[in-house]
């Protein structure tokens, strides 16, 4: 079955050339300023590296607002053009229709480091599965006994490959071999600092960031935060009050403001193996679409309100 991808009409972006896209975003380069990119966030939703249907209403706009909010909150150099040349940013933005601009990020072109950098502050997801099986979190031995959802003694840095299909964990030693010791150390420190700062900001908003993915680009020999930042697609958020109520069932304590409900539904409806043949025919029920939409909307309001 062929899926029709949501891509802005060329007449709406006459100054930009479409150069590719991923599971959620479409990428454009400016026809005159070849070092300026536009990332358009679609309403598509993916799980286990597959795009599903139907789309989540307003998802692209909400993700863009979350990401831009965090880019402005964190004391970190990033890829946003407005931080580099406000006059050029305002000029380019003024020629983009509002319904596209609200879902777009205008940024500097950079050499993206081909890894994703995940910081885990709480024992959940694949970290919890690893702990149950090996009593470690990605090779790190934990002292004492931990429950699902417990806060870890300190943030754990777990890089992965950056792939169009399935991302796989990367040992720190292999990361060092790929990008060099100094760069690996710098990125680990940056990710840990950004996560720690963001987690405190989120706590003040009544939220916990259980884990988060960061991506970086290189320009003029420096590393900058790139792609999306701490959105509902790239970070796992919990309600801080629910997390602290240990008498609640675990699914309520750790109910997250993201697409975990989609992942759970796919697991239940794709048979024993999650494969393209099993996932492609699936259509998400409207009740689930509305549930995820409300989660994104609630998270955005909690963060920015």
Curated annotation (Swiss-Prot):
Keywords associated with the record: ATP-binding, Ligase, Nucleotide-binding, Purine biosynthesis
Molecular-function GO terms, alphabetical: ATP binding; phosphoribosylaminoimidazolesuccinocarboxamide synthase activity
Catalyzed reactions per annotation: 5-amino-1-(5-phospho-D-ribosyl)imidazole-4-carboxylate + L-aspartate + ATP = (2S)-2-[5-amino-1-(5-phospho-beta-D-ribosyl)imidazole-4-carboxamido]succinate + ADP + phosphate + 2 H(+)
Pfam families: SAICAR_synt
Paired cysteines (S-S): none
Domain of life: Bacteria
Pathway: Purine metabolism; IMP biosynthesis via de novo pathway; 5-amino-1-(5-phospho-D-ribosyl)imidazole-4-carboxamide from 5-amino-1-(5-phospho-D-ribosyl)imidazole-4-carboxylate: step 1/2
PROSITE patterns in alphabetical order: SAICAR_SYNTHETASE_1, SAICAR_SYNTHETASE_2
Any one cellular-component term (Gene Ontology): cytoplasm
Biological processes, Gene Ontology terms: 'de novo' IMP biosynthetic process
EC number of the protein: 6.3.2.6
PANTHER family recorded: PHOSPHORIBOSYLAMINOIMIDAZOLE-SUCCINOCARBOXAMIDE SYNTHASE
Family the UniProt entry places it in: Belongs to the SAICAR synthetase family.
Protein name per the record: Phosphoribosylaminoimidazole-succinocarboxamide synthase
């Amino acid at each position: 079955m062929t899926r029709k991808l949501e891509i802005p009409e060329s007449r709406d972006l006459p100054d930009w050339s479409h150069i590719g896209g991923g599971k959620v975003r479409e990428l454009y380069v400016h026809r005159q300023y070849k070092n300026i990119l536009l990332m358009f966030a679609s309403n598509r939703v993916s799980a286990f590296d597959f795009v599903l249907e139907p789309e989540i209403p307003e998802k692209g706009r909400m993700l863009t607002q979350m990401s831009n909010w965090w880019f402005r909150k964190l004391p970190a150099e990033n890829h946003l053009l407005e931080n580099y040349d406000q006059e050029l940013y305002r000029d380019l933005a003024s020629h983009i229709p509002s319904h596209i601009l609200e879902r777009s990020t205008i940024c500097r072109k950079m050499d993206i480091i081909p890894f994703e950098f995940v910081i885990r502050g709480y024992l959940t997801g694949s970290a919890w599965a690893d702990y149950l099986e090996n009593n470690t979190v990605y090779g790190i031995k934990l002292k004492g006994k931990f429950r699902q959802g417990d806060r870890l003694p300190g943030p754990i840095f777990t890089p992965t490959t950056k792939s169009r299909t399935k991302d796989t964990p990367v040992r720190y030693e292999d990361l060092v071999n790929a990008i060099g010791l100094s760069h690996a150390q710098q990125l680990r420190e940056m990710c840990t600092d950004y996560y720690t700062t963001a987690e405190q900001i989120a706590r003040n908003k009544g939220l916990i960031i259980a884990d988060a993915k960061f991506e970086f680009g290189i320009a003029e020999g420096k590393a900058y935060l790139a792609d999306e930042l701490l959105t509902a697609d790239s970070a796992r958020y919990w309600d801080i009050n629910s997390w602290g109520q240990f008498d609640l069932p675990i699914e309520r304590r750790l109910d997250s403001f993201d697409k975990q409900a989609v992942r759970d539904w796919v697991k239940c409806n794709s048979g024993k193996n999650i494969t393209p043949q099993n996932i492609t025919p699936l259509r998400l029920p409207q009740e689930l679409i509305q549930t995820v939409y409300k989660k994104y909307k609630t998270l955005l309001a909690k963060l920015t309100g």
